[in-house]
Amino acid sequence: MQDSIEQYMQKVGQQARDASRVLTSASTSLKNHALSAIYTALENNQAAILAANQIDMEKGRSNQLDSALLDRLELTPARFKGMLQGLKDVIALVDPIGEITDLAYRPTGIQIGKMRVPLGVVGMIYESRPNVTLEAASLAIKSGNAIILRGGSEALESNKAIAEAVKHGLKVAGLPEHSVQVIETSDRAAVGHLITMAEYVDVIVPRGGKSLIERVTNEARIPVIKHLDGNCHVFVEAQADLQKALPITLNAKTHRYGVCNAMETLLVDEKIAEVFLPHIAELYAEKQVELRGCPETRRILGTTVKPATEEDWYTEYLGPILAVKVVSGIDEAIDHINKYGSHHTDAIVTENYTLARQFLARVDSSSVVVNASTRFADGFEYGLGAEIGISTDKIHARGPVGLEGLTSQKWIVLGDGQIRQ
């Protein structure tokens, strides 16, 4: 069986590499034509795709997947409509491929500049969310990359149904059908082959929990753009406008639980904790959010608040649970975030401009927010159209990874017969 999986993955890799050589020089109009044809195919096959998703949902329930995973897995008509809108947004994006920047003459008379080019073949490993299949496929096509998608086994039927529509659209436009491939096996050995096929794959994008990220980081022979978990914080500073702080901290936690940009720890300055905490605790109680607090939080709110452990400060709950800590000021808040956070998205609520700038400079996260919800950390909200993930790395791409994150630059040299003396 291992041999057959290896042969299957080698074939997928070769097909992706061949497709990437065509895509790299495909015109913007041709790529947009393919994306428009995919849009039509998805519209025409909505019922079949939603039916496939229901098969996955039923399996998920029978396998006792937790509520956060089931929420990520489910494709409702409204979410399907959102997927289609996201595809429209990608079509409308400016194509970065071929863009020449920093063109300048050198004393020798040659011109030096940089041209934006595709990465080549992207391998993506992710869990649960079928909408990621379409987002990743559309961004790859628009940026001239082939992509190999390995979704979670819990979403296999949904991903296969979406991939069929994508394949149809590519065929209509005359682009290689293997520009986008979904791995159609749940065998974990496929991941091992994908992350070591350096001759076929140029970059790996893992999007999932710590165990997945650790495995890919340890075993990959290919550059990795990591999408790690989102242990996000909001710090309500002493000079915060509480009329802003209340809706921000409520939205950051309760707008949607099972997403990586939801707040998991609330930090409150000790100077306003006595006033702020009872108000926000009342709002959380209405949403049935369980609070786990430090000793000072429990003194203010009462012992019905569970005591927070060291593990709680590190935890991405992806559910209606929130860790709460009262801090002495901005220094303790920043130290806490940089120690326990996942470098994803962290926010401050304050009316003090100097402290806001200090927070922006010192918090080591891919997105740092002032006076707004962490839920804005999203490719669509950032104007990227869609995202392939949110990178917590510092090299190549950081934060929401859109079209530009799937490209690199090469130097170009323009001469008129010059030779080096």
UniProtKB/Swiss-Prot annotation:
It is an enzyme of class 1 (oxidoreductase). Its EC number is 1.2.1.41. It comes from the Bacteria. NCBIfam families: PRK00197.1 (NF001221), proA (TIGR00407). HAMAP family: ProA. Catalyzes the NADPH-dependent reduction of L-glutamate 5-phosphate into L-glutamate 5-semialdehyde and phosphate. The product spontaneously undergoes cyclization to form 1-pyrroline-5-carboxylate. Belongs to the gamma-glutamyl phosphate reductase family. PANTHER family: DELTA-1-PYRROLINE-5-CARBOXYLATE SYNTHASE, GLUTAMATE SEMIALDEHYDE DEHYDROGENASE. This is Gamma-glutamyl phosphate reductase. It comes from Acinetobacter baumannii (strain ACICU). The lineage of its organism: Bacteria, Pseudomonadati, Pseudomonadota, Gammaproteobacteria, Moraxellales. The gene is proA.
